[in-house]
Design a protein with these regions (language model features):
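Short strand->helix junction
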Residues: 95, 221-222
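Acyl-group handling in specialized metabolite and lipid biosynthesis
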Residues: 85-100, 135-173, 292-298, 361-365, ...
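Short, surface-exposed, charge-dense and proline/glycine-enriched linear segments
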Residues: 147-165, 273-285, 377-386, 439-453
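Short, flexible turn/loop "capping" segments at secondary-structure junctions
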Residues: 79-83, 207-208, 289-292
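Non-catalytic, low-complexity flexible loops and terminal extensions
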Residues: 56-59, 63, 69, 156, ...
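Acyl-CoA-dependent O-acyltransferases
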Residues: 2-130, 298, 305-518
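Acyl-thioester-dependent condensation/acyltransferase catalytic cores
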Residues: 110-215
Length: 518
């Protein structure tokens, strides 16, 4: 999702390879636009040379600013009418003023908004009615008076200092969303208004004693985690004084309307009933406000422990599953031990579901740098008896087998067709009838590693990447984040008090793998 991938046809590449190598990145819009979209090639589009650089013609610059091109299908779910938050924690460098930091941040986000027009727009819903959830689209939005929202809590006695956060490895309990965010996150919907437009891209900078906490926000109807971290990557590049490479701009500004085809009349739609739930309303929210005393926690798995875990989970694999990933092994461990902590409340034949958010880019043949929503869900079911008695390798194999079977272009196209044909999409969620008492909902960006820890110019490299502590609990939620550039994994989870106590105080096997941060 952040790896730079681009290619040019052989003839053009051979003619310009030396020039291209010398100028791999430059200012926005000094690049080749989508040469291959809709059959375009260097032979049938106009490109110009200026100072040895490939530059888009005015025609293609105009296309990038046509906001209709960013209309998609997978981003149409009302459950995505929320802001996704990612916190980056930095120590404040010596001899660097706040004014310099804020100036660089402001210029960087302005540069990104200019280079990727939909990131400078806002999300609106049109055509909503009693029987339809309407259409989410981006619309023009005047630039904000200030590019970023700034808070100074360095003298706030109720706010932790950076040293305190670092000593405790930034537990989520110390990252209150009320202090470090300006708008709520999932699952609370954000409503566009004249006073506070639902801008696609937002940024909050909060100074604390000895440090800075930056909240990077993106509107979820317009981007998944790939797009979110793609925008952060571009801001970091701008703060380092770098321009944006051709391939990155191509994918960031890619036309979404024909990204992939929906099912045709002779193609059978799969059964997506598991994604249906009653409409989400204020009286019937996505998550019950009476969740069983659940809280959010951060758990760390070191790079060494992850290697050992994968080796253990790879012993005795089913013959039809020749390979499992580190995420498979970690998912199996969490699913098994969460179930062990819950088992006293349920019978052995109780069914548990592991709902896994999956990036569909590879299955669809889409670049990792594409920034729109391409997430779908793969659910795997086992009974409590199976989860508590099966060895880790068998559970990991079961997860991998289902992922291989369902993470296909056909499955994703079918899900998109299902969304497109459903007028009221408020009945559709990734988890469907998710039971927080028995199920686990998992997503992962663990594999990004160094990509999530770039240098931000004068700020340097962040020491922690976190989510803020939400105001709404979502029991059963599980997220894998890179804990460090060296390969550690920080797991962000939400469990009941009795469950987390069982894991961290009574489950000796769990404790040998995981370090509790808080």
């Amino acid at each position: 999702m952040a790896t730079l991938l681009w290619w040019l046809p052989g003839i053009l590449l051979s003619a310009l390879s030396r020039v291209f190598s010398a100028f791999r990145s430059y200012l926005p819009f000094r690049s080749v636009t989508e040469l291959h979209r809709n059959g375009h090639s260097p032979d049938n589009v106009g490109v110009s040379l200026e100072d040895g650089l490939l530059a888009p013609t005015e025609k293609f610059e105009e296309e990038w600013r046509d906001l209709d091109r960013y209309q998609d299908v997978l981003g149409q779910l009302p459950m995505l009418q929320v802001y996704a938050h990612i916190l980056y924690l930095f120590p404040v460098p010596e001899n660097v003023s706040r004014e310099e930091i804020l100036s660089d941040l402001s210029q960087a986000i302005a540069k990104v908004r200019n280079a990727v027009p939909w990131m400078g727009a806002k999300v609106v819903n049109v055509g909503k009615s009693a029987n339809s959830s309407g259409l989410y689209r981006v619309a023009e939005c005047a630039s904000p008076l200030n590019e970023i929202d700034v808070r100074d809590l360095s003298n706030d006695a109720t706010c932790p200092s950076y040293d305190d956060l670092k000593k405790r490895k930034a537990p989520i309990s110390m990252l209150d969303s009320k202090k470090f965010t300006s708008v709520p996150g999932f699952p609370i919907r954000f409503e566009d208004s004249k006073e506070d437009p639902s801008r696609v891209l937002r940024l909050n900078a909060t100074f604390i004693k000895g440090g800075l906490v930056i909240d990077f926000l993106i509107h979820h109807n317009m981007a998944d985690a790939g797009g979110h971290f793609g925008s952060i990557k571009m801001i970091a590049m701008a703060m380092r004084g770098e321009g944006f490479p051709i391939g990155l701009l191509q994918q960031a500004n890619r036309d979404r309307r024909n990204l992939f085809s929906l099912l045709g009349p002779n193609e059978k739609m799969l059964d997506h009933s598991k994604h249906i739930r009653p409409p989400i309303t204020s009286s019937a929210p996505l998550v019950s406000p009476h969740a069983n005393a659940a809280k959010y926690h951060v758990i760390r798995f070191s790079a060494k422990k992850l290697d050992e875990l994968k080796n253990l989970a790879s012993q005795g694999l089913d013959p039809d599953v020749p390979f499992i990933s580190t995420d498979d092994a970690l998912s199996a461990l969490c699913w098994k031990h969460f179930t062990l902590a819950r088992a006293h409340r349920f019978g052995p034949q109780t069914e548990s579901r592991f709902a896994r958010a999956v990036d569909g880019r590879a299955a669809l043949g889409i670049s990792k740098d594409y920034m729109g929503d391409v997430i779908h869900n793969v659910s795997t079911f086992l009974t409590f008896e199976q989860l508590t008695t099966w060895p880790l390798a068998r559970i990991a194999s079961h997860l991998r087998r289902h992922l291989n079977a369902k993470n296909t272009a056909y499955d994703i196209r079918s899900f998109a067709t299902f969304i497109a044909k459903t007028p009221d999409k408020s009945t559709i969620t990734y988890g469907g009838q998710f039971n927080p008492a028995t199920d686990v909902g998992c997503s992962s960006v663990r594999g990004l590693g160094k990509v999530l820890f770039p240098s931000f110019g004068v700020l340097g490299q962040p020491e922690f990447v976190r989510r803020p502590k939400p105001g709404v609990v979502f029991p059963g939620l599980l997220v894998f984040f890179p804990g460090s550039p060296g390969g550690d994994c920080d797991v962000w989870l939400c469990l009941g008090d009795d469950e987390i106590k069982t894991l961290t105080e009574k489950d000796r096997e769990w404790m040998q793998w995981a370090e509790y941060i808080g």
